[in-house]
């Protein structure tokens, strides 16, 4: 069953907000430092690939800390801070306009208008942006479901989906449909057969009782986006543990979690990448995933960690995000700090010398 935590609405005085917004606008207009935009080519490539394979469950899920293949989601913090505004901070954006946008976001997160962001305010914002990603997934799912339900009966069988999937891989749709109808063996390569097997397992899991192998629109959403379905989230966790678990005990040790991926390059540049891989995953394992710090991550711990609507996780993330930029150690995020560490929050470095902000202001 797809579930979503409802977000409480927040109200503020229009006069207070206007004054607050003017203060931020004045602050941003004072800054003329040069900007160095981040490289978003990977994100764009991933989005393009997603458009081409819209009926295939994505490896990347917005607002979820792990990819389906077990890799860390490098865009996670930007996704839960910017929500649908991520595209507004790409390499083509004008720096001053981007700074202004960032300050507008700051004012929205700063509910009590005290010109600083607390962990609680950031937590609520993260939950709001995560819900925003989910609503976007629901919207997109309606289009994807129509693509696999051409007769519009509100249900999709496994065979109907299989035809559409293979057609998206370049096979002749009519020939595939005829072969399935006549119970003939499909002429597909071994890799495609393996993918079909994995998709069938996921299809069965998304089929809510009583199982009929026909997916409704909501069930198809769970099929494509397991992160927002309790049963499918468990299935996703099992899949990740299965791929990383080397001794078959159905849990993960630190060595298993930080093991280097297959095909590791052997030159020095590759070694540097490997070192970063180990460092990042070790930090994530010890500080966030292994909640009882016993050196072992159970499926329950991994599920809690990956649950995008877990409020406790959102609070921990909020504290960590603030700590990254909290130079004055007051446990709050201030305008100068978020601008100086803009690359962490937006993917773009919007100014080089944040100290000039305070001096000029």
UniProtKB/Swiss-Prot annotation:
Binding site for Ca(2+) 5: 290, 292, 294, 301
Record-listed Phosphoserine modification sites: 98
Signal peptide: 1-35
Glycan attachment points: 39
Phosphothreonine, modified sites: 192, 216, 264, 298
Tissue specificity: A membrane-associated isoform is expressed in acini of the pancreas (at protein level). Ubiquitous.
Domain of life the protein comes from: Eukaryota
Binding positions (Ca(2+) 3): 212, 219
Sites where the protein binds Ca(2+) 1: 110, 112, 114, 116, 121
Described function: A membrane-associated isoform may be involved in the exocytosis of zymogens by pancreatic acini. May regulate calcium-dependent activities in the endoplasmic reticulum lumen or post-ER compartment.
Family that this chain belongs to: Belongs to the CREC family.
UniProt protein name: 45 kDa calcium-binding protein
Organism: Rattus norvegicus (Rat)
Gene it is expressed from: Sdf4
């Amino acid at each position: 069953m797809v579930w979503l935590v409802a977000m409480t609405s927040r109200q503020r005085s229009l006069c207070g907000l206007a004054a607050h917004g003017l203060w931020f606008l004045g602050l941003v207009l004072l800054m003329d430092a040069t900007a160095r935009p981040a490289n978003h080519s990977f994100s764009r490539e991933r989005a393009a690939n997603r458009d081409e394979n819209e009926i295939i469950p994505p490896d990347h899920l917005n607002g979820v800390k792990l990819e389906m293949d077990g890799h860390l989601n490098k865009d996670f913090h930007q996704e839960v801070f910017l929500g649908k505004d991520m595209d507004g901070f790409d390499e083509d954006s004008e720096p001053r306009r981007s700074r202004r946008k960032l300050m507008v976001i700051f004012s929205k997160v700063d509910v009590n208008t005290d010109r600083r962001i607390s962990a609680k305010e950031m937590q609520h914002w993260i939950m709001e942006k995560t819900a925003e990603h989910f609503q976007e997934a629901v919207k997109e799912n309606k289009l994807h479901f129509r693509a696999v339900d051409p007769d519009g009966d509100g249900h999709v069988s496994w065979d109907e989906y299989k035809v559409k999937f293979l057609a998206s891989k370049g096979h002749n749709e009519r020939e595939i449909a005829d072969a399935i109808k006549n119970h003939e063996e499909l002429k597909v390569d071994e890799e495609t057969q393996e993918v079909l097997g994995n998709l069938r397992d996921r299809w069965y899991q998304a089929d809510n009782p009583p199982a009929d192998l026909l997916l409704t629109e909501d069930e198809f959403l769970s099929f494509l986006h397991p992160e927002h379905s309790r049963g499918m989230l468990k299935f996703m966790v099992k899949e990740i543990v299965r791929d990383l678990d080397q001794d078959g005990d159905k849990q993960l040790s630190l060595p298993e979690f930080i093991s280097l991926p297959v095909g590791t390059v052997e030159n020095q540049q590759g070694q540097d990448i490997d070192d970063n891989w180990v460092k990042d995953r070790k930090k994530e394992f010890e500080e966030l995933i292994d909640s009882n710090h016993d050196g072992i991550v159970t499926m329950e711990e991994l599920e809690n960690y990956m649950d995008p609507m877990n409020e406790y996780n959102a609070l921990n993330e909020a504290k960590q995000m603030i700590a990254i930029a909290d130079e004055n150690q007051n446990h709050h995020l201030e305008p100068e700090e978020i601008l100086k560490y803009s690359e962490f929050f937006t993917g773009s470095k919007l100014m080089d010398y944040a100290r000039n902000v305070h001096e000029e202001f």
